[in-house]
Amino acid sequence: MKWKLRKSLKIANSVAFTYMVRFPDKSFYIGFKKFKTIYGKDTNWKEYNSSSKLVKEKLKDYKAKWIILQVFDSYESALKHEEMLIRKYFNNEFILNKSIGGYKFNKYPDSEEHKQKLSNAHKGKILSLKHKDKIREKLIEHYKNNSRSEAHVKNNIGSRTAKKTVSIALKSGNKFRSFKSAAKFLKCSEEQVSNHPNVIDIKITIHPVPEYVKINDNIYKSFVDAAKDLKLHPSRIKDLCLDDNYPNYIVSYKRVEK
């Protein structure tokens, strides 16, 4: 692959860029990539072929043009430009992007925590209401056949009021989002992580699940529902709800029983 760069753009001293991948069938993908990590080290941007599964699949059948659209001296500026471009072309029939931005991932782009966030983001693809209902129906049917009442199962499925996140910091500077990944790195059991001499901090945080999200006059049951309607990433909706500069974005949390 070979990147095309306009003569007016200078890579030197830039840390990130936005790009477009164009295919012969007119389809295209807009993305963001770093020239350098937060530690100032060069990345593999010259060999980078996108994290999009759709792009990777199309590359098996087509040759693509890789175009650097703009260069930036900060990750945040590049992400904002990426979001602006995707919004501009989101209704274009040839665009391959399925969501607008992954805004919160710019904080620690090379940490283990960031990698885990990306992994979780791909695992938690937004499902349609029809798909969710089918999953619920199958669960209810399964437990019904195992001597559990439908009311009990429905209550069990919808009973989650909070989710737990873990942050484990090591002396080496590495951070992990689970005891399993930390144990693998430290070559010990999960039970031994808490008392391991290389562990300097363990934080366990309970994040309440929204009771509702209100944006302008519209009320949604979750960040995901709001994101689907506004064509934003759920994490971006959450960030806006917590930002004092956006008073029209409101979130109300359920009370967590202790």
Swiss-Prot record:
Domain GIY-YIG: 14-96
Enzyme Commission number: 3.1.-.-
Organism superkingdom: Viruses
Annotated keywords: Endonuclease, Hydrolase, Intron homing, Nuclease
InterPro entries referenced in this protein's UniProt entry, alphabetically: GIY-YIG_endonuc, Intron_nuc_1_rpt, NUMOD3
GO molecular function: DNA binding; endonuclease activity
GO biological process: intron homing
Catalytic class of the enzyme: hydrolase
Function (record text): This endonuclease is specific to the nrdD gene splice junction and is involved in intron homing.
Protein name, UniProt field: Intron-associated endonuclease 2
Classification lineage: Viruses, Duplodnaviria, Heunggongvirae, Uroviricota, Caudoviricetes
